[in-house]
Amino acid sequence: MTVAATFEIEYLQFLGPDGKLVGTLPPAVADAKALLPLFKQMLFVRTFDTKSIALQRTGKLGTYAACLGHEATHVGIGASMKPEDVFAPSYREYGAQFMRGVKPREVLMYWGGDERGNDFEGPKNDYPWCVPIATQCLMAAGAALAFKLRKEDRIAVSCCGDGGSSKTDFYAALNSAGAYTLPLVLCVINNGWAISVPRSAQTGAKTLAQKGIAGGLHCLQVDGNDIIAVLEGMRRATERARNGEGGSVIEFMTYRLHDHTTADDARRYRDEQEVKDAWLRDPMTRLRTYLTAQ
């Protein structure tokens, strides 16, 4: 038998759920003090998220998509970009956007029904929140193509959920990135659920990262609750993009600890024990435990 091709998907993890090291730290975070500003930012994101949910519950905010449990992934992605890069988020990546200069009041304006919240004071080159699923991925691919044609030292980063990786725009984006060797990083935030559809019902692929193989992209799976792994995965992908080596697909393994939005009741389709188990992998507790031990 002749084998036409084989592939492997590397999994990155440095901090286990108990906050203990399971691998050699990357040089950039060998000193635990380097993680303190990121922990503070994660704490801010969680506080903002909790307050926003409370505002919605008391009728002071419209439907809101919480990011509870995504703090390490979002902050790590935002910390890995340069100001001149372009970020194309979905509707949940507040942690990354805060790192990019988006104001908390702009988030509240948007979810309060005021589209002026999408006119960011800070990152003028970033795309606004995108509610249609995965269309932002193709927008980012277009930006990446422009950077290449202009020979600019810039990259494009886009986020979508596990459900978004089943959409045609996601596939079109990764195919374009591979065909034209674009400086694009596609971040698939796998939180286990596409609203009420579990990961197991979305695709037959063993990993979501491997979907990039078909487009000729570099693929990686990362523990999205371990901010050190997030930073290292993004470092590899952004360096490849800046060096002209093409795009990447990174699957960040995390969990949606809240409902899909405040208009959803996840208790109707999600097992209570599953959520309890997910809290044991909480990114905030994990990083706090590690930092306290240093």
Question: What would you call each of these model-derived segments?
Answer:
Residues 128, 132-294:
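Glycine-rich ThDP/TPP pyrophosphate-binding loop and its adjacent helix/strand module
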Residues 1-27:
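Charged, compositionally biased N-terminal leader segments and the immediate start
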